[in-house]
């Protein structure tokens, strides 16, 4: 993460510099913990995992800090994928039965923006299995809303980089 990429995403330079500074401080704390745990012989222990989790709980995700719109722009300006693309739909899957197609870009799952396939996998595992949720996809430049039951979708995913 660089100040330059955050500024390209539309954040003012002072806020961008502050975010980068705080992220660097957190990264250093994690590196220091790892070094200390390695030197003191507790790197692969419950103690290390607990201390690492305590540190990470203090951290605020960049997405939460700057919001979806700026996060989308940040991903794009830093050369990262910012869309979840359906590489293929499995025959007989909930996705196929709901009308999902190869090449669809999944924008939202249950009214939450999706920027990478990990987020989508986590989202499909939340809530009550089988409950129908709205999945907004972009297909050939058109927004399409699909209703799909929670749980495995039956799709293969890739990422795409699309200008916000």
Task: Describe the function of each predicted region.
Residues 46-49, 59-62, 97, 101, ...:
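PDZ-domain C-terminal substructure recognizer with occasional recognition of PDZ-binding tails
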Residues 89-90, 109, 138:
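Active-site-proximal beta-strand/loop segments in catalytic clefts of secreted hydrolases
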Residues 75, 111-112, 125, 143:
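Terminal low-complexity interaction tails
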Residues 95-118:
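Conserved PDZ fold ligand-binding element
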Residues 51-56, 84-85, 99, 109-110:
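Non-catalytic effector/regulatory segments
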Residues 1-74:
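Interdomain regulatory linker/hinge segments that flank or connect interaction modules
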Residues 63-88, 92, 96, 114:
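Coiled-coil termination/hinge junctions
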């Amino acid at each position: 993460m660089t100040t330059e990429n955050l500024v390209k995403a539309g954040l003012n330079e002072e806020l961008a510099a502050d975010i980068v500074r705080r992220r660097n401080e957190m990264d250093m704390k994690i590196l220091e913990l790892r070094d200390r745990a390695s030197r003191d012989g507790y790197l692969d222990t419950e103690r290390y995992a607990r201390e690492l989790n305590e540190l990470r709980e203090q951290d605020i995700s960049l997405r939460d800090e700057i919001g979806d719109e700026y996060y989308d722009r940040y991903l794009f300006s830093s050369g990262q994928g910012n869309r979840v693309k359906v590489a293929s739909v499995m025959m007989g899957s909930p996705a196929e039965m709901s009308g999902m197609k190869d090449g669809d870009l999944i924008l939202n799952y249950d009214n939450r923006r999706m920027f990478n396939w990990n987020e989508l996998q986590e989202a499909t595992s939340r809530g009550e299995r089988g409950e129908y949720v709205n999945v907004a996809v972009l297909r050939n430049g058109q927004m399409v809303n699909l209703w799909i039951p929670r749980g495995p979708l039956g799709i293969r995913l890739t990422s795409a980089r699309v200008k916000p």
